[in-house]
Amino acid sequence: MYDSSSKIKDLSLAPFGKLQMEISETEMPGIMTIREEYEKLKPFKGAKITGCLHMTIETALLIETLQKLGARIRWCSCNIFSTLDYAAAAVSTLENVSVFAWRGETLEEYWWCVEKALTWGENGEGPDLIVDDGADASYLVHKGAEYEKLYEEKKILPDPESGKNEEERCFLSLIKSSILKNPKKWTNMAKKIIGMSEETTTGVLRVKKIEKNNGLLFTAINVNDSVTKQKYDNIYGCRHSLPDGLMRATDFLISGKIVVICGYGDVGKGCASAMKGLGARVYVTEIDPICAIQAVMEGFNVVTLEEIVEKGDFFITCTGNVDIIKLEHLLKMKNNAVVGNIGHFDDEIQVSDLFNHEGIEIENVKPQVDRVTLPNGNKIIVLAQGRLLNLSCATGHPAFVMSFSFCNQIFAQLELWENRNTGKYEKNKSYILPKELDEKVAFYHLKKLNATLTELDDNQCEFLGVSKTGPFKSEAYRY
């Protein structure tokens, strides 16, 4: 039944969304196995879960699974361009599920959606648990509580005009408005949140920064560093969805072209592999000597951006850092160069500086594709305004890969909920899921690919010092 409190683009898209969900079920064996094992037990009975994660078909199946396991849910997307409106429509019809997401939100609308997903009652009551991607929901709670304390002690409100960009101004404006309505909303909310689970490298970095400053207000589980998330979603997911996004956006041939991959972490490895497989000449920029030598050993040229900026045909950022491709680089690019980002946030490329630069002409070619005429007459193509091109110009990672990531999210949420009164997890610390669960997630997906495990005999188990059921590797093992 549709929850009238939801805000989506078009409810009539729900039947198509449900059909897509049904098709994707066969490609998400881990998610479906969890349903079979836990649905009758209803382990999330009584739990209120807020999600801030790309509202795709795969996410719709995650939401439906959490709902079938007994949770009540409020959900928003974590990117203004990544929502698939038919997916949002489909899940909005589920019982005990409210959705606040549509494709093409403004930044003001985006943060409104995040606040709505976090707010469970008229008095500002919040969730028990947060499923996060980029840590935006958790960040809002933390910064809201921080500014409430400042207001309580010094009567100082956040100044939206002090924001360094439009998004920060919208963010500060929301918190200011919230404090004027309810000056203890975020503080009280944080006290009752059991914990959050974070999906991305960038989000984990945010959480770690807060933790380092002793500011973490509730438990955090780092899903990103589970092997079955990091090595599958980050590598194989990007290897599929980067070329998908580039082809849908540009229809340009990749074979023979010069592709510059900025960053050679797991995401960069997947991107470089995809481009190499399509016949591109791949160049990598890196700051880390270990990652750099890995790139060289895979046959890639490791250069500085300054060396290659005037020659590249495609530039892809995937560093999780800021200001990787600066305005000065963009202005030097060759005619028809394509610039895109597959890192979580939009600050890897100085798109805003480019769009506001004197002498620039911007022509929207189609949704999330802009052709920019530079002062020297060259035209470059900017994808998704520097936001995630694989989710903005295409539909993101395939369902099979997301099944791994979302199994980890569910197990993280279960760990937090089932141990809420045991003292296993401290309030102000972050954790990684146990290796047993990592191996369990991998096991769930073997049958779908017709893979059969070899079983150790007793003598082999004794020699290795492991049990027949695992875990098979130490925590220090690097896959």
Curated annotation (Swiss-Prot):
Its cofactor is NAD(+). NAD(+) binds at residues 200-202, 234, 263-268, 286, 321, 342-344, 390. Binds 1 NAD(+) per subunit. One of its GO terms (cellular component) is cytosol. GO terms for biological process: one-carbon metabolic process; S-adenosylmethionine cycle. It catalyses: S-adenosyl-L-homocysteine + H2O = L-homocysteine + adenosine. Keywords: Hydrolase, NAD, One-carbon metabolism. One of its GO terms (molecular function) is adenosylhomocysteinase activity. Signal peptide: none annotated. InterPro entries: Adenosylhomocyst_ase-like_sf (IPR042172), Adenosylhomocysteinase-like (IPR000043), Ado_hCys_hydrolase_NAD-bd (IPR015878), NAD(P)-bd_dom_sf (IPR036291), S-Ado-L-homoCys_hydrolase_CS (IPR020082). This is Adenosylhomocysteinase. It comes from Plasmodium yoelii yoelii. The lineage of its organism: Eukaryota, Sar, Alveolata, Apicomplexa, Aconoidasida.
